[in-house]
């Protein structure tokens, strides 16, 4: 069995770090910036960054609708921070004036952008994470939280009483 080919959306965020972590875990990893690259992967990581900027880059590069289609067809995806925001079905405080964060609608959840406050309110701390033996060190920089998790969405972690990590569960799983 060959290693899965996992793409990392390379528009913003920790692209190199995600690519290296995937390789270390045994996956074949590649940056994704074009439609052909998107269509060549078995899964996708959407890193952190600025969700409105990432949304408009996806749109400008003609990746938004193809990505929505692939996700609707079951492409596995992981989203960190802005990536989690974009994977949501609904985004609160999405922006205005043509610079809104655009939901990919991959997970039935409502996410609030910048929920923990402004840059000056950033913090880090240890959080319990479902399925892991010990706490995970997490960094929250203008971070989102999940306001609503729909049916088929498993809550994985909370911080300061708010859901900060989820998994969308396939109906067949």
Swiss-Prot record:
Domain of life where this protein originates: Bacteria
Arranged from A to Z, the UniProt key words for this protein are:
Glutamine amidotransferase, Hydrolase, Lyase, Pyridoxal phosphate
Q: Does the keyword Lyase apply?
A: yes
Q: What does the record give under GO molecular function?
A: glutaminase activity; pyridoxal 5'-phosphate synthase (glutamine hydrolysing) activity
Q: What is its EC number?
A: 4.3.3.6, 3.5.1.2
- PROSITE patterns named among the record's database cross-references: PDXT_SNO_1, PDXT_SNO_2
Protein's UniProt keywords contain Lyase: yes
Q: Which residues form the active site?
A: 81 (nucleophile)
Q: Name one GO biological process term.
A: pyridoxine metabolic process
Gene Ontology cellular-component terms for this entry are: cytosol; glutaminase complex
Chain residues that bind L-glutamine: 49-51, 113, 141-142
Q: Which reaction does it catalyse?
A: aldehydo-D-ribose 5-phosphate + D-glyceraldehyde 3-phosphate + L-glutamine = pyridoxal 5'-phosphate + L-glutamate + phosphate + 3 H2O + H(+); L-glutamine + H2O = L-glutamate + NH4(+)
Pathway per its UniProt entry is: Cofactor biosynthesis; pyridoxal 5'-phosphate biosynthesis
Q: Name one Pfam family in it.
A: SNO
- Subunit architecture: In the presence of PdxS, forms a dodecamer of heterodimers. Only shows activity in the heterodimer.
Q: What's the family?
A: Belongs to the glutaminase PdxT/SNO family.
Q: What does this protein do?
A: Catalyzes the hydrolysis of glutamine to glutamate and ammonia as part of the biosynthesis of pyridoxal 5'-phosphate. The resulting ammonia molecule is channeled to the active site of PdxS.
Name the UniProt record assigns to this protein = Pyridoxal 5'-phosphate synthase subunit PdxT
Query: Which species expresses this protein natively?
Result: Mycolicibacterium paratuberculosis (strain ATCC BAA-968 / K-10)
Q: What is the lineage of its organism?
A: Bacteria, Bacillati, Actinomycetota, Actinomycetes, Mycobacteriales
Q: Which gene encodes it?
A: pdxT
